[in-house]
Amino acid sequence: MKCTEKACAKVNLTLCVGNKRQDGYHEVTSVMQRISLWDTVTVQRGTGRDRLLCDAPVTEDENDNLCMRAVRVFFAETGLKSDGVTVTLEKRIPMQAGLGGGSSDAAAVLRALRTLYDSGISDGALERMGAKLGSDVPFFIRGGTQLATGRGEVVSPLPPLAAGWFVVVKPAEGYATVEMYRRLDEPGSVLVRNSRYMQDAVAANNVHAVAAELHNSFGRVVPKGSSLRIIKDALRARGALGTLLSGSGSAVFGLFDDREAALAAAEALRETWPLTFLAQPV
């Protein structure tokens, strides 16, 4: 038996990172939005042993991959017995981008296993499993538009954003998440903003108001020589209402209210940055 799931990327419309907690994590408040850029995850049961197949190079040991960790967590938490699971990944979401590709893949594996083993597990239970894998994984169980708090693993649904287009640009450089958090820990780096106005803008499906409220703590600590400013300027020159780093980077997105303008911008920027994508909220 097989089950295929879309593992969609996300962008952070807001990302406010607070001080480090005693457990080593940071307090986070983020309005997160799933977008129509996805990996394809196929899970097949009854293959004799657990294994991972991927059409892109996998940098870590197979057992350390989030998808295979998701397999182990699922069976450990449910008490079900694996009859051998093969996870096949077709990657399209860039890595080291702040778009949540690995976390979304892991969430897709959990959803597929729930279907294949007919376990009847609730979304809430899958979110708790996901929290054992990474802070972003719970968001991807349901996706849509959500408010993330805690270290990012506590998610609450928001009214869906049903307007606007995103042009997402991934430059050649990648940012290490651990290093970006370290930079935020330096004195004077943390700037906390309220996400309440963004929630109101999303609820109203007001793209101009959403663009006005885009903010990300990590934008203050990007490495010297980053392409961030150049990409943001290029997006604005092509009509973006607002631009922002997604997650801890290095992908940057521009928000447009018109599909044709967004499409033209994506085609133009792709000449300089090949990993440029047109997406909408889903």
Annotate each language-model stretch with its function.
Residues 1-97, 115-127, 160-161, 170-173:
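ATP-binding N-lobe of GHMP and related small-molecule kinases
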Residues 48-60, 109, 206-214:
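Short, basic/glycine-rich phosphate-binding loops at helix/coil junctions
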Residues 88-117, 135, 241-256:
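Glycine/serine-rich anion-binding loops at beta->alpha junctions
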